[in-house]
C-alpha cells in the first residue's frame, strides 16, 4: 500500500518511551503538505501514546479513538514546522489506555490534550502486528523517512441549514477512497476521528460567522467506526456560556449518534 506508514503517520521519531515516564517524539510537517489542520497535532499525540501502549502489550492490542476530555489549540503551525510531542500514559491495561499530552512548536505550546481514553482492541483486526513491531523499531532508532505526508483534503461538508450565530446543519461525506485509509487502518479502513473533529469545527465556525476561530474541543466521544463512503448528518447548536462561545456538535450515521463534542470558539 502506497500510503502505509506515510499518509497518516505523524511521528517521525520516538525519543523516549519508558513506561513510567513521559513519552517523547518528534514530527516535522512536510514543507510540501497542502493542508495540515490543527487537529492533526492531537492525532500525533494520540499516535505517540498508541505506540508506547502497543509496545507495552507486545503489539497484541492497539488503542482506537474513544474519549477526549479537552483539547486546547495554541500557537499556529503549518508546513515546515517541527512538532515536539509529549504523551503521559496515566494507565495502560488490556481494556484501554488513558493519557494526556501536548505539542510544542518552537518552544511554544501548540496543543494541549487532557484526559484522553482509547479502548483496546486486537491489533490484528486493524493491522499486521509484525509490521507494527518493525515500524516501532524504526521510529526508536533511525527514525522514519521525512516528507511522508502530502497533507489532507478539506472536509467535504455541505451546509443544508444555516441560522447565523445560532445553528448549522449539513452533511459530511466521507470519501470512498483516500490515501490515509491505507494508514488508518490497513485491514479495517475507518475515517480518522481527528479529521471528523476538523470538519465539525469548520461547521461550528461557519455557524458562528466571520472573525471566529476554533480554540478547542471538550467532551469528545467517538461511538462507532465510520467507514469509507459513508455520509454523516452533522449539526451544531451555539450558545454563550458565561461569555464563552461554545457549540454542541453531533454527528449521526444512519440515524444513530456517531460522535459528539463541544467546540470552543473565540471572536477575533
Where are these regions (language model features)?
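Non-catalytic linker/capping segments at the edges of enzyme domains
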Residues: 1-35, 60, 74-79, 90-96, ...
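Generic secondary-structure microfeatures
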Residues: 29, 46-49, 174-176, 201
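Compact, glycine-rich, soluble single-domain proteins
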Residues: 33, 37-51, 186-189, 197
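N-terminal cationic amphipathic segment used for targeting or macromolecule association
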Residues: 44, 63-65, 166
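Hydrophobic beta-strand-centered segment that forms part of the acyl-chain substrate-binding groove
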Residues: 49-86, 110-111, 117-118, 201-235, ...
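Short beta-strand/loop motifs in extracellular/secreted proteins, especially
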Residues: 99
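Internal, hydrophobic beta-strand segments that form the core of beta-sheet-rich folds
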Residues: 102-104
Amino acid at each position: 500500500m502506497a500510503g502505509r506508514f506515510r499518509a497518516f503517520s505523524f511521528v517521525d521519531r520516538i525519543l523516549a518511551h519508558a513506561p513510567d515516564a513521559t513519552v517523547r517524539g518528534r514530527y516535522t510537517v512536510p514543507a510540501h503538505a497542502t493542508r495540515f489542520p490543527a487537529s492533526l497535532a492531537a492525532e500525533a499525540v494520540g499516535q505517540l501514546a498508541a505506540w508506547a501502549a502497543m509496545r507495552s502489550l507486545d503489539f497484541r492490542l492497539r488503542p482506537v479513538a474513544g474519549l477526549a476530555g479537552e483539547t486546547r489549540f495554541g500557537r499556529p503551525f503549518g508546513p515546515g514546522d517541527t512538532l515536539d510531542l509529549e504523551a503521559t500514559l496515566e494507565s495502560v491495561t488490556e481494556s484501554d489506555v488513558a493519557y494526556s499530552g501536548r505539542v510544542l512548536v518552537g518552544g511554544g505550546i501548540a496543543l494541549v490534550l487532557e484526559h484522553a481514553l482509547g479502548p483496546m482492541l486486537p491489533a490484528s483486526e486493524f493491522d499486521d502486528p509484525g509490521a507494527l513491531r518493525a515500524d516501532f523499531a524504526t521510529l526508536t532508532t533511525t527514525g522514519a523517512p521525512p516528507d511522508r505526508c502530502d497533507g489532507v483534503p478539506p472536509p467535504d461538508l455541505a451546509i443544508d441549514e444555516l441560522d447565523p450565530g445560532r445553528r448549522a446543519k449539513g452533511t459530511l461525506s466521507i470519501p470512498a477512497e483516500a490515501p490515509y485509509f491505507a494508514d488508518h487502518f490497513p485491514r479495517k479502513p475507518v475515517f480518522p476521528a481527528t479529521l471528523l473533529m476538523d470538519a465539525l469545527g469548520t461547521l461550528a465556525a461557519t455557524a458562528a460567522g466571520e472573525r471566529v476561530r476554533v480554540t478547542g474541543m471538550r467532551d469528545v466521544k467517538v461511538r462507532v467506526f465510520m467507514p469509507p463512503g459513508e455520509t454523516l448528518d452533522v449539526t451544531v447548536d451555539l450558545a454563550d456560556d458565561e461569555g464563552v462561545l461554545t457549540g454542541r456538535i453531533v454527528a449521526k450515521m444512519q440515524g444513530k449518534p456517531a460522535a459528539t463534542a463541544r467546540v470552543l470558539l473565540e471572536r477575533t
